[in-house]
Amino acid sequence: MIKSELVQIVAARNPHLYHRDVENIVNAVLDEITDALAAGNRVELRGFGAFSVKNRPSRSGRNPRTGDSVFVEEKWVPFFKTGKELRERLNPGMNGNDNGEDD
């Protein structure tokens, strides 16, 4: 699903809202999440998951085409951890027992 499809679905479920307003709301939510992450904050949507940023330290890498060693600079990357309710919905019938044993 892409952003425009999300806007269409939300607008269809909320016929009292203008399509333009739904698009503005979706954009505002995404902008706020992006701004929070850029500021180094964590964004938690209870039951859905949490967005955060993680540091990838600099390292020595390899150019796959030439095999030459290259320096890869340190960078910050977005990270998403799923919430319990989302995991349960994606895996119906699972009882939340994470020990790997069968019931």
From Swiss-Prot:
GO terms for cellular component: chromosome; cytosol. Heterodimer of an alpha and a beta chain. NCBIfam families: hip, PRK00199.1. InterPro entries: Hist_DNA-bd (IPR000119), Histone-like_DNA-bd_CS (IPR020816), IHF-like_DNA-bd_dom_sf (IPR010992), IHF_beta (IPR005685). This is Integration host factor subunit beta. HAMAP family: IHF_beta. Keywords: DNA recombination, DNA-binding, Transcription, Transcription regulation, Translation regulation. Coiled coil: none annotated. Belongs to the bacterial histone-like protein family. One of its GO terms (molecular function) is structural constituent of chromatin. The keyword DNA-binding applies. The keyword Transcription applies. One of its GO terms (biological process) is regulation of DNA-templated transcription. This protein is one of the two subunits of integration host factor, a specific DNA-binding protein that functions in genetic recombination as well as in transcriptional and translational control.
